[in-house]
Amino acid sequence: MGLKDIFKRQLRTVIEWKEQKANLLFHQLETTTDEIKDASKLIIAPGQGCIIVYDGQVRATLTEPGVYEMESDNHPFITTLLNISQQAESDHKMRFYFFRTAEMVNILWGTASPVKYIEPDYQLPVALGVCGNFSVKIQDASQMFVTLLGTVADYYAEDVQELVSSRIVTPLTAFLLSLIHISE
């Protein structure tokens, strides 16, 4: 690590989620060292929120657009000098998990393949299936982060689709099969 890199790590930074994909619900912002200097700035755009994890604990959930000043125990030059025995690496880490506050609509779900059976009265083959769509809006980002995501870097609409399918489609398929057996 050169002198230029050490100097650059001492500067305050501006943190923001610039490239928000249309199907992305949660995103862990990658920073070079997670050693965010005191008085760095966090920018939250409309339709975004941010969970701040500092020293391993959720410290804040921000949902209003704006510019926020970050407070940390990492001070320019002083922290680096005090941690020279740890290769100048601070043990005070700050991570940012951005999330979409806008509603995500028209996420499709359905049975992977239809349930087939022979209709008893006319002896015709019938295929039954279920499908639909749903919308997702994150109401309690901290709860979702702690109970579902943990430190997952990215969480997409497709992940929600898989979760819904595993929890709803399988029981619905079993229900359709039970209806078929009742009618026979």
Label each residue range with its predicted role.
Residues 178-184:
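Residue-level detector of conserved catalytic or cofactor/ligand-binding positions
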Residues 168, 173, 183:
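Long C-terminal interaction/binding lobes of large macromolecular proteins
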Residues 160-170:
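Extended, charge-rich, solvent-exposed interface segments
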Residues 1-127, 131, 135-149, 153-160:
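Interfacial loop/beta elements and low-complexity acidic/Ser/Thr-rich segments
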Residues 141, 148, 171, 175-178:
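A short secondary-structure junction motif
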